[in-house]
A protein has these predicted regions:
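Gram-negative (and chloroplast) outer-membrane scaffold detector with strong preference
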Residues: 61-133, 141-146, 154-160, 193-210
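Outer-membrane beta-barrel translocator domains and adjoining extracellular loop/strand segments
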Residues: 37-45, 84-93, 127-136, 175-183
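Short glycine/proline- and aromatic-enriched beta-strand/turn motifs that initiate or cap beta-hairpins
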Residues: 15-72, 201-210
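A structural signal for short, well-ordered beta-strand segments
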Residues: 29, 119, 164-166
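Short hydrophobic "helix-edge" motifs at membrane interfaces and signal-peptide entry regions
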Residues: 2, 147-148
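Cleavable N-terminal export/targeting peptides
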Residues: 1-22
């Protein structure tokens, strides 16, 4: 019992100083939902598109706090990947999205936890590695994109924290590229000429402070 109390007290003391660190490295993973237009997919039925929108996301980020104590201004970088896939009788889609961007953040630091708002503008690499009647078919588009994230973290020790992050990512495109049967062509977006696409992810992970 004395040992357990000692461990809890030690952990609490460590947690009190976790917010004093000026840099952090984070890794997260969790569910993700595709937002906006699904472009170039192999099946346009409502049920297929609804299932295709559900996927997974993961991210790695670095952040350096450059000013402030209770409210800290920070700069850093984010990589986020995501995957969405579904199959039907005559084909399949596997959408992969990779996003990289510099980040700026505002963090409210408390004794045992912190809340953070972050965002940035970067580049999103999109590829749908689909199949039609067993033949490979690729859809791709690489576009400027932006993200906005809200996260919360509870300090576990003086260096480690458990965190959750809600991240919204958005981009738009006028055309996308299709490659099928060794032929490649560009497809213009119908109607408005532009297409919004992106994702909303809720990820969970660990932060290392140093």
């Amino acid at each position: 019992l004395c040992f357990l109390v000692g461990v809890l007290l030690t952990t609490s003391l460590y947690a009190q100083s976790a917010g004093d660190k000026r840099s952090s490295f984070s890794v997260h993973a969790g569910p993700s939902w595709y937002l906006g237009q699904l472009m170039g997919i192999t099946d346009r039925s409502d049920a297929y598109r609804s299932d295709l929108r559900k996927g997974v996301a993961w991210d790695v980020s670095y952040l350096a706090q450059v000013a402030g104590r209770k409210f800290q201004f920070g700069v850093g970088a984010l990589y986020q990947g995501s995957s969405y896939k579904n199959t039907h009788d005559t084909g399949a889609d596997k959408i992969l999205m990779h996003y990289m961007a510099p980040q700026i953040s505002l963090t409210m630091v408390k004794k045992h936890y912190q809340l953070q708002l972050a965002g940035g503008i970067g580049y999103q690499f999109y590829k749908d590695k689909s199949k039609v009647y067993g033949k490979p078919r690729d859809v791709s588009m690489d576009k400027l994109a932006g993200n906005l994230a809200l996260s919360g973290e509870y300090f576990l020790t003086s260096h480690w924290g458990a965190s959750a992050r809600l991240n919204w990512l958005a981009s738009s495109t006028e055309t996308y590229s299709v490659k099928y049967h060794d032929e490649k062509w560009n497809v213009e977006n119908p109607k408005t000429g532009t297409g919004y696409f992106g994702q909303l992810s809720l990820v969970f992970g660990l932060n290392y402070h140093f």
